[in-house]
Regions:
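Membrane-interface loop-to-helix entry segments
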Residues: 138-169, 184-187, 360-370, 396, ...
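Flexible loop linkers connecting adjacent transmembrane helices
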Residues: 2, 35-39, 61-85, 113, ...
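Hydrophobic alpha-helical segments and their helix-loop junctions in multi-pass secondary transporters
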Residues: 155-183, 193-212, 374-386, 410-422
Length: 422
């Protein structure tokens, strides 16, 4: 066990990691595709939407590390303590969406891998290769490898994205968009706004992933961080992910806005168009800047998602099996890692032209589940199991009330829009 009487700075390094992995999970399609498209179509008009979405979800994701540090157990264990209804609600939503989500982020990563390497393979073969790489990393290196690789990727991603934005600002070929942009208050505009804010910066159920990563980090280092240290880690990751979302919006605004192109296309098509227009606007020398930024954004998401779902499902299975005398062997993390990834590849292979519909369905389920998980996390934190010094401050409680009202209204608006204009 690491000693806890060391200086705050020396012990903080042991707490850092889970929040960065959460950020890596967040910085994927929502950033590379949705944020960049927001800038491409509306200039800087939708910065407020990113900030508002991030603010409204903040309390419910912050409750993840707060609960885990205060109790020493994951929020999934907390859901079970609230009642089996909470745990099985989470499990049901996860099972309905996990393979489609993993398949969606993997195929976008696959298209970028083809551009990065110049090796022309089918999207399915590249997707298989990407997932095999992720599985190998996680099976051999486990959480320790995930922690180290994500920290490296986050550095590369942050540097490459910052350079890409600075180059776009400084280029004579990239003009700052005029203040007047197309109205967002149209059928198509509101539909896009819902998609942008719904995934920004990450879904609330990711608080369960974060909780499990904290427990793994404690096992890895032998150090149990103080609440303040764990919240610093969370804030670095969460706020950093929100800042990078604005950076990708700036890329779209500076490079793609006013190009006259149609950006209402799939994620793989959008990333190809982004790279093409970025290069044609700034010059061929800028190709590697945008490709590296895009690939690291998507690979980090694919790697973290490939870890998150098996870790979550295996934990839930073993949590329930703890009631029996002999937990089954197939409930192990490695088994789930292979099974879930294989099923995601099956989804990719069989879906074909129906894949976009499946992604849309998963998106709908995720949006409608957001207020449910916000309520569960709120109830978990204010259930009376907390000691006074771990209870959230009043401002966070008030923010959670606002967030719950906003997220619920947002889900109702999303459902209304789907039923009225689909």
């Amino acid at each position: 066990m690491k000693k806890t009487n060391s200086s705050p700075i020396s012990t903080l390094k042991y707490a850092l990691g889970p929040g960065l992995i959460l950020a890596a999970a967040a910085i994927g399609v929502s950033h590379l595709v949705q944020s960049t498209r927001a800038g491409a179509e509306y200039g800087f008009l939708l910065v407020w939407a990113i900030l508002l979405a991030s603010l409204s979800k903040y309390p419910f994701l912050e409750f993840g590390p707060r609960y885990t540090i205060a109790t020493g157990e994951s929020v999934l264990h907390g859901y079970k303590r609230l009642g089996k209804w909470a745990l099985w609600t989470f499990t049901t939503f996860t099972l309905l969406t996990m393979n489609v989500v993993q398949a969606a982020v993997t195929i976008v990563t696959a298209s970028l891998a083809a551009k990065l390497t110049g090796i022309a393979l089918t999207p399915f073969i590249w997707s298989t290769i990407i997932l095999l790489i992720c599985i190998s990393i996680l099976m051999v290196g486990k959480y320790s490898a995930l922690d180290k690789i994500i920290k490296l990727i986050i550095v590369i991603l942050s540097v490459s994205t910052t350079i890409a934005v600075i180059v776009a600002f400084g280029s004579s070929g990239a003009a700052i968009p005029p203040p007047v942009a197309p109205s967002i208050w149209t059928v198509g505009g509101v539909s896009f706004l819902i998609a942008l804010m719904g995934w920004m910066p990450i879904l609330i159920d990711a608080s369960a992933w974060h909780s499990l990563w904290i427990l793994e980090r404690i096992k890895q280092t032998g150090y149990s961080p103080k609440l303040k240290e764990s919240l610093i880690d969370f804030n670095v990751g969460y706020i950093g992910a929100s800042v990078l979302a604005i950076a990708f919006l700036a890329l779209g605004a500076l490079v793609l806005y006013g190009s006259g192109e149609n950006f209402a296309i799939s994620g793989t098509q959008f990333t190809s168009k982004l790279i093409s227009l970025y290069t044609s606007t700034l010059g061929n020398w800028a190709y590697w800047i945008i490709v590296v930024a895009a690939f690291t954004a998507m690979f980090s998401t694919t790697l973290t998602v490939t870890d998150a779902y098996p870790r979550t499902i295996s934990y839930i299975l073993n949590l329930n099996a703890a009631e029996s005398e002999e937990p089954l062997g197939y409930k192990s993390y490695n088994s789930m890692l292979i099974i879930i990834s294989a099923l995601s590849l099956v989804v990719l292979y069989l879906a074909g032209s129906r894949f976009i519909f499946m992604v849309d369905l998963a998106t709908t389920i995720s949006f409608l589940s957001a207020p449910v998980f916000a309520f569960i996390n709120y109830k978990l934190i204010f259930s009376g199991r907390f000691k006074q010094h771990n209870t959230p401050p009043n401002w966070l409680k008030w923010l959670s009330w606002f967030g719950l009202a906003f997220i619920t209204s947002f889900a109702v608006l999303f459902l209304y829009w789907k039923l009225s204009f689909s």
